Amino acid sequence: MGGGSAIRRVKRNFLQGKPVSTGKKEVCAKTQGTVIVFGEYGVHKSGKGEYELLRKGVTIGIFSEAQIKEDEVLFALSHGVILEVSKGGIKEIITPEKATLLGLIAADGSNMFRREQRLRGSYRTEYSTRFYSDDKELANLFSMLSEEIYGITPHHYNRKKDNLITSVIYNKGIFYDLTDLNIKGGPYEFHVPRDHLNNDGKKAFVKGFFSGDGNVSIAGDKITIRFYSSYKEGLEELRLVLIDLGFHPHEILEYVQPTGIVYCFSVPREEHVKFINEIGSYKPRHVRIFEEYLRKSGYEVEKRDDGS
């Protein structure tokens, strides 16, 4: 992936916490030394302690902080986006926190706009990003991630007859941010931003999605782990992500139900413990079944860093 898109995103007014300076300029004399070089890209540290990102010797961005690894350098942009510089060039990577949020929305959310005609022929456009759940814990997770990534607290609407909680963010910038990533399309459609996810991001996205549209059942000392969706293309993308992570999910099956066609695939029994330990779920019912299964199978119940 080329560097143009990443640099343009740095410049977008919607982003906050952007680099100290952007735009091309000649290499400053105050540069103290080269930190690392990947092909035509290099990272230098200046006398002010800032990190300069260069392409062919020209500074294209200045950052106050950098995470330097042997095979990559990471710069935090904003709203859950990291700029990754490596031998492959530069590309935008989504943080695990944002990947979790996107997984929740892909499973049980929407991202849309609505135009309403007003008096005298004018129009009003409402932009909204929504998440639907009857689990208070998942609604709270959606709120926490929204606040952490975008700095916005969603509105919550409770439907008493079935305890459905609708969490809504009314924000044009967030709508376009998610539209750029092609997370949601028409009804029931979703896509996985696979090109913007590293392994940690892939695990987080799958966990967010599974918490919404996943199912785990237990019978005796055996469990079944399944992913469901009415949108086969998105489900196949999710299946490919699990393959990227070293899983061997079964092929997608089709079920005809009174409400329409539903697609699903399952995780092989021999990979259940791997799934629980590496992916898991935020849904309380899933967590209880996973813990019961591990105890019955003689495995120690691990406490994950994210609290699940």
Residue ranges: model-predicted function:
Residues 2-308:
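Internal intein/HINT superfamily modules and their associated LAGLIDADG
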